[in-house]
Every structure is written in C-alpha cells, then in structure tokens.
Amino acid sequence: MKKTILTLSLLLFAFVARAQWTLQTCGEYDYTRTSGSSASLAFKGDCQLADNFNIGLGLQATTLGRYSLNLQYQVNLFKAKSGTLYLENRYLYRLFPNYKLQEFNALLDLGWRNRHFNFQLGLTNRYTAPIPLRKNGGMDVTFEPMNITFCVEGNLFDQEHPWNVGGRISNYRDFVIERFTLFFYSLNGYYDFGNGLRLTAEAGVHPCGVLNLSAQYNGWFGNVGLIWKP
C-alpha cells in the first residue's frame, strides 16, 4: 500500500512539474462615491496541465476589508482554424468582515476565442450568508438561483505580439460577479520585456455600490500588474 501511494505521489509530482505555470500579481486603485478611495493587491497562478485543460487560483485583499478567493478551470471542447470553443467553471468566495457577511458564487459558461477576440456567455448563482453560518438559515440568508454572465473582449494583435491594446465589456471580473444589467467597461494593454515577463495595465468604469447593490452612478479603477511565465 505504501509503495502504491509513493508511486502515485511521484507520478503526480512529475505530472505537475512538467505543467506550464503562469504567475501574476496586480495592484489596483478604485474610487466610487459610495466607498471612496480604496486599493487592492491580488496574486494569481495558472497551471496548464494539458493542451486542453488549465486550472487557476487567485487571492485578493482590499483596504476596505474585503477578501476574495477565486478557483477556476477551463476545458477546450473544440479547436479549429477559426478559433476554440471552451468551457469555463469558476467558484468565487468573498468575505466581508466589516459587514459580518460572506458570499459564495458559482459560474459556468461557454466561450469562443481566436487570435483577436473572446466571447463568453454563461450562468451563475450566488449565496450570501452571515458570519458565522447559521444551521437553520434565517432572514439574513439570501440565494440568487440564476443570473446571466457575459464577456466580450478584443485585442489589436494576437497574444504572441510583444505589445497589445484592447477593450472589454462584461458583468464580471476575476474577483466580482455583478448582475446582468451592471457592466464593467475597460481598456487594457500589455508590454513584453522578454524572458517570460509581461507588464499589464487596465483602466475602466464599473457600477457603484456594495454587496451587489447598485447606485445610479459609476466608479472608476486602474491597475498595473506583472505576469511571469517561468
């Protein structure tokens, strides 16, 4: 039994060691009339385990006292010269200690991407509960069974070009999922330094409010990050 466990462990280690890793860190500044100024720091890692499968994990902390954990994976379903059809599944957990609340999100969508464009359409649900969890639920527990998610983004060049600019419209980002009618608009770009190091930047506007409650005006955000492919 011990030999079997050791053999399986070595095979798993060898499999993961051969995988292609991507590491990313990103700092962001955000301003809204409801919350004022805030900053956040995020760390993300992606692992390409096979040609048609990758898995990613992300962590974010903000000066407003919000903490987020994002786990996701993608599976390529079909490849053609015109693009790739893929399935994405992500799970997002957000913690709001100041409000004594926590939020669980699950998202499943289909996507189509090619050298210049990416389009995704899917469904998500959300479960919000107090801290600590109550065994019998209660009036403070809410469940949103279905919400439509979408993302449309395009780039001037393909992803192998040494620099690029593009735009994105969606109702979700790595660490937040909004309702279908609340959009994020952003412009983004990157520059490759070589040796697997890439500088990224993004600026955009987004809905105001907290805990997915919207206001009648927008806030804005900007971020700068580094991506490293060992």
Which residues does each PLM region occupy?
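Flexible, solvent-exposed loop segments that connect beta-strands
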Residues: L87-L101, A129-F143, F175-E178, L211-S214
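Repeated loop/turn-to-beta-strand initiation elements of outer-membrane beta-barrel proteins
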Residues: W21-L23, A50-L57, F78-L87, R115-L121, ...
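Transmembrane beta-strands of outer-membrane beta-barrel pores
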Residues: G27-R33, L59-T63, V75, Y91-P97, ...
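Residues that define the transmembrane beta-barrel architecture of outer-membrane proteins
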Residues: S35-L41, T63-L69, L85, K100-A106, ...
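Predominantly the C-terminal beta-signal and adjacent terminal strand-loop region
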Residues: N171, E178-P230
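Outer-membrane beta-barrel proteins
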Residues: L49-D51, N70-A80, L95, L108-H116, ...
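Sec-dependent N-terminal signal peptides
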Residues: T4-F15
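Short glycine/proline- and aromatic-enriched beta-strand/turn motifs that initiate or cap beta-hairpins
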Residues: A19-L64, I227-K229
